């Protein structure tokens, strides 16, 4: 037996080598990294659970590989029989093993990408695999603008100084990996990078290998499943951990790199420390759209917590700065201030570790910074007390209340150093610190508030009924606008404490009261989701005034559904034609466009085109009224929700729509991919900055009139096809709920938000995230491609010359190319054979025809797409991505089969399986069985629910996107 097992174990390595594509280039170490992590993991698995379990994991991997080779559905059934024969404990161990192996494969990829990137930069080439098409190296961008496009260095510098990229972190419930595991993954990445370093001694190598084993084992021994849903405060703390760990240090490093890159085009100035190049905002604890757990109290807590964290980070750095600025020479202006502060402070401060005695006047910079430190200490402690007790005994006067007070003494130090010939010192840590203060302020991030438009109408309705003038909700749009404007132009208070309030109305008003009580710099925009008309914006302006918001938030309508996008330009034109409103906004307006719900409403093709046209029309309206419009892009992580490579996504926006200000959501699962490590944070900031600059200075081509006509025609056909299936087929919802794990999605405890807007109802009430998540799990990706095939077929059958036009559009028009490339990537990740297995096991016979028809549609769409792109094979232009996907396939297939059969057992109590004897090496009462006890409340047979959740997490890791 032992000999057989050894042979079997050797065979997985051979199998891996067979399945894995060859090296793509000389510096391709992906296979090496992946094999090392896999070997280490399998050794750990064997140590913990015995040879039999290891052999079982290898057998599943091999069977999965056989399916990948031939796409034979019988192989999936054979694999299913093996997986269903496992007892509950073994089943959890196997599902968990594959989920971990996928996470390790992802880590190997990340290390490989970073390794190739460093090599390219050393050689002076472009910094990513597909060359400049997917990457925006800032120095390359500067040189391209100057050398190829004839821009002067001064023009580039001027555009750069005045542009803003605002990254808005959202707590979308799509980060399916626990933070405890993310931290271990970061350490695994680190060990792997160092193991392959050049100057490593044998002893160091052994120690790193031991550390790698330790971290892989710690990750495997950590429960992957969140046992309780996170609260909004948890989500916010998780989001803030990225600021703490990478963004805080990443911003000054990135800005320093920009200074260096500017020298390459002959600009010897630095970017001004207060240039608004990068800004950060957040929705965590502010986004109450459909999330009853985000209460006014949560919003207050989140703001105070962020302020406390900011003060703490500044405080932790100020002593380093005091050590650095030990000079005695200074300007007269600074010396006078230092003497004044010195004479006012006589006491020693024993609560400080460094510089606790009174600082002598011959260290003037330290005297100034000592005062800054005192104020930061008080700011932090006051905020801590407000957060804990609601009141503080520290007077506000001894704290920093606005950013100018904080920057003023730092600017004084900077000016003084420059005036005495010490500019190199000024441009060191002091400049970095000033850039941090300028970027993060006292509030750390600006919190956006988001609320559904209907909730504001409910409040207005309560007010008009109380005043006895009728029902706001029953009025026409004209009546609403007339009343709102007359109130906005008047002075009288609208309501007092006697206004009858439902819980919902009270919640909305209390949110405005919290906004009025907290410092104004805590907040960014007030976003109205499901906005349709001008009154949606005006009613929020009125409520801000009524609740005494001293510095009203800018009000941002969010247009999401197809019809709302089409009506958006008219709504905006109506707003801009109101004198009161134009005076209020001071020449600036922001509009948010939603990718998720428009995609769910009409399909990806029509939604993408509608978003493109809506942006063009909105910009046109803004220009007519002389208003600078900022577009806020609500993109998800998945392609179905507007995701995709940053650089391409920005460069494919319509010309003129960015103009140096770009605001975009960075959602749930994408935050880790963008900011999880320092080098990822750097790359993210670089991509956004470079692509925004390039879009403004070299706008993409505008589509030709005949391309527009073709797109219009295709969008109509695609929407019709999409809606006829998703909304009009009476049995589609039943099919969707049977064929995917949508009903079970809520068990993952990913986020604090419910997955439905309303408890009952069909696809309309389902949130976009679970809708996409469910189809991603079965690898069918229906919302992404449905409609494309019908549209292509229609225009090609109408006139075969249209194929040539589509190919021309693909080659010349960035928007169209990005759309097609992203769909192609999704097809490369998809597998209709897997979706067919779900149908066979979970869907009743009378609904099979729906699935068969959709799979035929999938195949036809894929073939037409390849014709349009002029490709023989999927991803033929991106061998690296092709290699990475092939590496993951066998893991994902095992998890898919395990998921489909587990769903069958959960949903059909009469489904019979033959269990084999327990495999785990300890007795049947030991570890594997203990795993079952982690979930004591499950309503299903032991182990099934956890096995299911582990497969969901594993597949999400393998597809590299959740919802």
Swiss-Prot record:
Taxonomic lineage: Eukaryota, Viridiplantae, Streptophyta, Embryophyta, Tracheophyta
Oligomeric and partner information: Homotetramer.
Entry cofactors: Mg(2+)
Family: Belongs to the PEPCase type 1 family.
Protein name: Phosphoenolpyruvate carboxylase
Active site: 172, 600
Subcellular location: Cytoplasm
GO biological process: carbon fixation; leaf development; photosynthesis; tricarboxylic acid cycle
Gene3D superfamilies registered for this protein in UniProt: Phosphoenolpyruvate/pyruvate domain
GO cellular component, one term: cytosol
UniProt keyword Magnesium present: yes
Native species: Picea abies (Norway spruce)
Catalytic activity: oxaloacetate + phosphate = phosphoenolpyruvate + hydrogencarbonate
Pfam families named among the record's database cross-references: PEPcase
PROSITE patterns: PEPCASE_1, PEPCASE_2
Claim: rRNA-binding is one of the keywords in the record: no
Signal sequence interval, chain numbering: none
């Amino acid at each position: 037996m032992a000999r057989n097992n050894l042979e079997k174990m050797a065979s997985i390595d051979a199998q891996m080598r067979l399945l894995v594509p060859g090296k793509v280039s000389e510096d391709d170490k992906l296979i090496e990294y992946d094999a090392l992590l896999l070997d280490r993991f399998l050794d750990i698995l064997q140590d913990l659970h015995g040879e039999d379990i290891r052999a079982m994991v290898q057998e599943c991997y091999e069977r999965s590989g056989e399916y990948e080779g031939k796409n034979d559905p019988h192989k999936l059934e054979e694999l299913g029989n093996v997986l269903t024969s496992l007892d509950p404990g073994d089943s959890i161990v196997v599902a968990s093993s594959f989920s971990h192996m996928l996470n390790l494969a992802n880590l190997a990829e990340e290390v490989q990408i970073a390794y190739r990137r460093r090599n390219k930069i050393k050689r002076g080439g472009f910094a990513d695999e597909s060359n400049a098409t997917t990457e925006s190296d800032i120095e390359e961008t500067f040189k391209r603008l100057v050398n190829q496009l004839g821009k002067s260095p001064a023009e580039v510098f001027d555009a750069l100084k005045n542009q803003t990229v605002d990254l808005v972190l959202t707590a979308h419930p799509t980060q399916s990996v626990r933070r405890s595991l993310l931290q271990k993954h970061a350490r695994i990445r680190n060990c792997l990078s160092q193991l392959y370093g050049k100057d490593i001694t044998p002893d160091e190598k052994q120690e790193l290998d031991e550390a790698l084993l330790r971290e892989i084992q710690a990750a495997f021994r950590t429960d992957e499943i969140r046992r309780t849903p996170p609260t909004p405060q948890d989500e916010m703390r998780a989001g803030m951990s990225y600021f703490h760990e990478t963004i805080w240090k990443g911003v000054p490093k990135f800005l320093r790199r920009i200074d260096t890159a500017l020298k390459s085009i002959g600009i010897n100035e630095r970017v001004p420390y207060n240039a608004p190049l990068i800004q950060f905002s957040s929705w965590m604890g502010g986004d109450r759209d459909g999330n009853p757990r985000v209460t006014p109290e949560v919003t207050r807590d989140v703001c105070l917590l962020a302020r406390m964290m900011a003060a703490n980070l500044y405080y932790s750095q100020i002593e380093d700065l005091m050590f650095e600025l030990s000079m005695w020479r200074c300007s007269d202006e600074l010396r006078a201030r230092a003497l004044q502060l010195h004479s006012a402070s006589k006491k020693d401060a024993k609560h400080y570790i460094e510089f606790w005695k009174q600082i002598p006047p011959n260290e003037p910079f330290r005297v100034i910074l000592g005062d800054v430190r005192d104020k930061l200490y008080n700011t932090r402690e006051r905020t801590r007390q407000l957060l804990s007790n609601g009141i503080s005994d520290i007077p506000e006067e001894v704290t920093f209340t606005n950013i100018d007070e904080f920057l003023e003494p730092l600017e004084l130090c900077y000016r003084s150093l420059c005036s005495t010939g010490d500019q190199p010192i000024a441009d060191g840590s002091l400049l970095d610190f000033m850039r941090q203060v300028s970027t993060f302020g006292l509030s750390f991030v600006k919190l956006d508030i988001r609320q559904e438009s209907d909730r504001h109408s409910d409040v207005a309705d309560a007010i008009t009924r109380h005043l006895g003038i009728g029902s706001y909700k029953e009025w026409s749009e004209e009546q609403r606008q007339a009343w709102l404007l007359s109130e906005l132009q008047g002075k009288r208070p609208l309501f007092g404490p006697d206004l009858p309030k439902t819980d919902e109305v009270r919640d909305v008003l209390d949110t405005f009261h919290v906004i009025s009580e907290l410092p104004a710099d805590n907040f960014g925009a007030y976003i109205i989701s499901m906005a349709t008309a001008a009154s949606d914006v005006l009613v929020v302006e009125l409520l801000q005034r009524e609740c005494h918001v001293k510095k009203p938030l800018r009000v941002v309508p969010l247009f999401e559904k197809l019809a709302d996008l089409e009506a958006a330009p008219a709504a905006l034109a109506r707003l801009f034609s109101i004198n009161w409103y134009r005076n209020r906004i001071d020449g600036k307006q922001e509009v948010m466009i939603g990718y998720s719900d428009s995609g769910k409403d009409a399909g990806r093709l029509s939604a993408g085109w509608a978003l493109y046209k809506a942006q063009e029309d909105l910009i046109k309206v803004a220009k007519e009224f002389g208003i600078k419009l900022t577009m806020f892009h609500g993109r998800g992580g998945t392609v179905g929700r507007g995701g995709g490579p940053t650089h391409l996504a920005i460069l494919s926006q319509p010309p003129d729509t960015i103009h140096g200000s770009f605001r975009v959501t960075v959602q749930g699962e994408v935050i880790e991919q963008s900011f999880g490590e320092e080098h990822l944070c750097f790359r993210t900031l670089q991509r956004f900055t470079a692509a925004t600059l390039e879009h403004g200075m070299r706008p993409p081509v505008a589509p030709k009139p005949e391309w527009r006509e073709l797109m219009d025609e295709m969008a109509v056909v695609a929407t019709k096809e999409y809606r006829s299936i998703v909304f009009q087929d009476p049995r589609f919802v039943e099919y969707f709920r049977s064929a995917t794990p949508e009903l079970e999605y809520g068990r993952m405890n990913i986020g604090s938000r419910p997955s439905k807007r309303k408890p009952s109802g069909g696809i309309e009430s389902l949130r976009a995230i679970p809708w996409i998540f469910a189809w991603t799990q079965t690898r069918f990706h229906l919302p992404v491609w449905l409609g494309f095939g019908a549209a292509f077929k229609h225009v090609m059958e109408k006139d075969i010359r249209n194929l040539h036009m589509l190919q021309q559009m693909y080659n010349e028009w960035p928007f169209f190319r990005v759309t097609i490339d992203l769909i192609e990537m999704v097809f490369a990740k998809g597998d209709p054979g897997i979706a067919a297995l779900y149908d066979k096991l979970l869907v009743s016979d009378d609904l099979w025809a729906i699935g068969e028809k959709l799979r035929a549609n999938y195949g036809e769409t894929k073939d037409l797409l390849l014709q349009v792109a002029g490709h023989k094979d999927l991803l033929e232009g991106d061998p690296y991505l092709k290699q990475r996907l092939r590496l993951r396939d066998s893991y994902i297939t095992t998890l898919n089969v395990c998921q489909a059969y587990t769903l069958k057992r959960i949903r059909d109590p009469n489904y019979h399986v033959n269990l084999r004897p327990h495999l785990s090496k300890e007795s049947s009462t030991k570890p594997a069985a203990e795993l079952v006890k982690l979930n004591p409340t499950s309503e299903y047979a032991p182990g099934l629910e956890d096995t299911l959740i582990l497969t969901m997490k594993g597949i999400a890791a393998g597809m590299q996107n959740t919802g």
